[in-house]
């Protein structure tokens, strides 16, 4: 699952039994959050972030970082288009207050080595995707087409 959905599927797996759960570009426990997210969690700073800034932020990132970032933002907008403010506030609160202290032993974690949202320095036990970014599920489709079937079928 992708980003927040990785957290959601791990919570679902506590209710519905699975042989394995695969997460992509996500985290396995709250201890894998980068330091700035951990600080935001402890101070509740995320609550002062107006969720309607998300659209403005995407435009800003595209302007500052150029065509590649703009292309990633367009993909993000296409695949993450549900932007109801109440949902976004709930999602941020749920994300920052996730209480998973230890990774679940059946979670398989696939993560890009260039992910700037969840840098690999904070992660333990994951399958690295060389040069993969946080949006690698879109841009590294060849890697996923070649490797995901093996990961799924492997015992």
PLM regions and their residue ranges:
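Conserved small/polar residues in nucleotide/adenosyl-binding loops
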Residues: 1-5
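Hydrolases whose catalytic domains are alpha/beta-hydrolase-1, hotdog thioesterase
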Residues: 7-12
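Short loop/helix-cap segments at secondary-structure boundaries that form the rim of catalytic
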Residues: 13-15, 102-104, 116-125
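Flexible "cap/lid" loop of the alpha/beta hydrolase fold
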Residues: 15-52
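Conserved beta-strand scaffold positions in the cores of enzyme catalytic domains, especially
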Residues: 21, 107-109, 124-128
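Conserved alpha/beta-hydrolase catalytic His-Asp/Glu region
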Residues: 53-99
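Short beta-strand/loop motif that positions the catalytic acidic residue
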Residues: 109-111, 115
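Catalytic active-site module of serine/aspartate enzymes centered on a nucleophile-bearing elbow/loop
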Residues: 127-155
């Amino acid at each position: 699952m992708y980003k927040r959905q990785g957290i959601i599927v791990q919570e679902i797996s506590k209710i519905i039994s699975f042989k394995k759960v695969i997460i992509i570009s996500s985290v396995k426990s709250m201890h894998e959050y980068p330091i700035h997210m951990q600080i935001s969690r402890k101070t509740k700073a995320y609550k002062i972030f107006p969720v309607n800034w998300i659209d403005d932020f995407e435009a800003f990132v595209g302007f500052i970082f150029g065509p590649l970032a703009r292309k990633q933002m367009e993909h993000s907008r296409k695949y993450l288009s549900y932007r109801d403010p109440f949902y976004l506030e709930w999602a941020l609160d749920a994300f920052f207050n996730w209480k998973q202290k230890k990774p679940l032993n059946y979670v398989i974690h696939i993560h890009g080595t260039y992910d700037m949202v969840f840098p690999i320095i904070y992660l333990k036990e994951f399958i690295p995707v060389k040069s993969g970014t946080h949006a690698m599920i879109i841009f590294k489709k060849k890697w996923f087409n070649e490797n995901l079937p093996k990961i799924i079928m492997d015992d």
